């Protein structure tokens, strides 16, 4: 599962094909309250625009027992490599 942790206004730049948007603050709250525990069965990839928030999200989710990695360099790096995107 690919999680885009950017804010809604950042999505106008596009997003990775198939990614689900949950802004970082909301994602952390949901993880801490057990609202997304069903995702613990999945491998999760997080990203933001530059990688900073994606790393925070991955670290927090890993602390909560999720199997999470981040895309180094975020969406900017993803686009630079010519990968598939929506928008």
Predicted regions located by residue number:
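Rhodanese-like catalytic fold shared by cysteine-dependent sulfurtransferases
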Residues: 1, 8-45, 49-87
